[in-house]
Structure formats: structure tokens, C-alpha cells
């Protein structure tokens, strides 16, 4: 805390330094990572996730913001903290929407594998996309070269060719990350038929989505169906680093589809 003197020579009130919200949020994710870090390789993904949640929630209380969790650990009756609608921060300006995933990749952590991360995204109040009942969404994530080239409504072959053209490379030089799931069998086959290299991952698609926008990672595109909360957070991260993402909500059944339609969210349209 700094103290300045007035023109009379008398000390003025203490001058508090401006607080940088981005740096404060780094401390939040750092705390969550350190909390989960004690559980790396110990085979208990539930304990790892809880440690990350506890650490992130405690640190959020010190952040200078008036935040509301839009995407969190679930509804209030499902999660004791970081639930959807919970107020976080110390109540000071700015007013923001908050999306959190204290530990993205709980199984990766439990198994001692890489690419588990703690993530948080903030946006001006009322601007964070809320996916409603949608648990999953179709996603395509790319770097700056892919902006304007990809189309979630186009075929995988068309998107591989479009990205290759935008990056001035052969389709055989395009590397695509896909979650290893049965639902992706046709997608994987078409991507390979188009000439792309397919890197399969078991869990955690936020890290490779961000990697698609960073040079030297060996990732050109993330493709496929994954969690909607992770999709929103990935989109925020990609926007910050100059990449891009397109997505469509992917209802698991007719009941979920109707819930989305009732809330004004049409799964047939890009989110």
C-alpha cells in the first residue's frame, strides 16, 4: 500500500494500486491446479476434482469482481459450490458472467497423464452464452488462419480441405484432435480419408482446442462432439488468443431437444 503527500505536506489517504482482473484470475486457476496437483497419479478423480473446486472457490472470494457463475459444477441442488447462479468475487466492479471448470481432465489427473488444466472465463454481465440443458455440442476449433474458412455445417472433408487451403499446405499436413468415442467412428474415418492425421485423446478437449491456435503444437484443428461447458470456455480462450471456434448444440434425446427449443435454443443452428 502506497502513501502520498498532499500539497500541504501532510500525508494523504493511502493510495491503493489498481488491481488487474486477469492476473487475479491466474491466481484462481493456479490455486485450483495446486489443489488438484496433490492427487496426480493417485487414482481418485473425485478427490482430485473436489480439491480443485475447494481451492478455486476459496481464492475467488478475494477477486475484485461482482461475478455470477453461468457455467459451473451444476445446479444448486447438485453442487455445494461453484453452482450455476452462485455469486463469486468480493462484490466490487466489474459485473461479470463466469464460467469455470476447476479441473478439466479429472481422469487424466487420477492416472497421472498430461493435459489436465484448471480454467475460468469471464465476460461482461449478460454476454456469456448459456447452453441450457445441452450437455454436449459439436465443435470445430482452429487457429487464426482458419477463421472464415471452417463451417460447422460443412462436411469434415470440406473443412479439412478449407483449412489446408487457408494454411497453404496439403490436407495430409493437417493434424486433427478428436476425442476417442464410439460416436466419432464415422468422423475419424472421413478425416483420414480426406488425408488428415487424426490424433485421438481419451479426455480433456480444452487444452487441444487452445493448442490449435498456438504455433508449434502440432495441432491444426479440434473436431467432434464434447462437453458444452468446455466448449464455451474453449471459445472464450480462443477468442483471447486470436483463434476461432464454431459449435452446434447436440441433444442426446428428444426430451433434451425439446427443452432446448423451449428455451429458444435451436440445435440445428450454430451456437
Predicted regions and their residues:
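N-terminal subdomain of lithium-sensitive/metallo-dependent phosphomonoesterases centered on the IMPase/IPPase/PAP
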Residues: 1-99, 161, 165, 206-207, ...
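Solvent-exposed alpha-helices and their adjacent loops that cap or buttress functional pockets
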Residues: 61-62, 87-93, 101, 109-113, ...
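Oxyanion/phosphate-interacting regions
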Residues: 2-14, 21, 211-229, 233-271
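DPxDG-like acidic metal-binding loop motif
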Residues: 93-104, 108-128
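General beta-strand structural signal in soluble alpha/beta enzymes
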Residues: 69-73, 98-100, 109-111, 130-131, ...
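Anaerobic metallocofactor- and corrinoid-dependent redox/one-carbon enzyme cores
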Residues: 24-35, 39, 47-50, 80-81, ...
Amino acid at each position: 500500500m502506497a502513501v502520498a503527500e498532499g500539497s500541504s505536506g501532510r500525508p494523504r489517504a493511502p493510495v491503493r494500486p489498481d488491481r488487474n482482473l486477469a492476473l487475479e484470475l491466474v491466481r484462481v486457476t493456479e490455486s485450483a491446479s495446486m489443489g488438484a496437483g496433490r492427487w496426480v497419479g493417485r487414482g481418485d478423480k473425485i478427490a482430485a476434482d473436489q480439491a480443485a473446486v475447494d481451492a478455486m472457490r476459496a481464492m475467488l472470494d478475494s477477486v475484485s469482481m461482482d461475478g455470477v457463475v453461468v457455467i459451473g459444477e451444476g445446479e444448486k441442488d447438485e453442487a455445494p459450490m461453484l453452482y450455476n447462479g452462485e455469486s463469486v468475487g468480493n462484490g466490487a466492479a466489474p459485473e461479470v458472467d463466469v464460467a469455470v471448470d476447476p479441473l478439466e481432465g479429472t481422469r487424466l489427473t487420477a492416472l497421472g497423464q498430461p493435459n489436465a488444466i484448471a480454467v475460468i472465463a469471464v465476460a461482461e454481465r449478460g454476454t456469456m452464452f448459456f447452453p441450457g440443458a445441452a450437455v454436449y455440442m459439436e465443435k470445430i476449433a482452429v487457429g487464426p488462419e482458419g477463421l472464415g474458412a471452417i463451417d460447422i455445417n460443412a462436411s469434415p472433408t470440406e473443412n479439412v480441405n478449407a483449412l489446408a487451403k487457408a494454411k497453404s499446405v496439403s490436407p495430409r499436413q493437417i493434424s486433427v484432435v478428436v476425442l476417442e468415442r464410439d460416436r466419432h467412428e464415422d468422423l475419424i474415418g472421413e478425416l483420414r480419408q480426406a488425408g488428415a492425421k487424426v490424433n485421438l485423446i481419451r479426455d480433456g478437449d480444452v487444452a487441444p482446442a487452445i493448442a490449435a491456435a498456438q504455433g508449434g503444437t502440432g495441432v491444426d484443428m479440434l473436431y467432434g462432439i464434447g462437453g458444452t461447458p468446455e466448449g464455451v470456455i474453449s471459445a472464450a480462450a480462443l477468442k483471447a488468443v486470436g483463434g476461432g471456434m464454431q459449435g452446434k448444440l447436440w441433444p442426446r434425446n428428444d426430451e433434451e431437444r425439446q427443452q432446448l427449443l423451449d428455451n429458444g435454443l435451436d440445435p440445428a443452428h450454430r451456437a
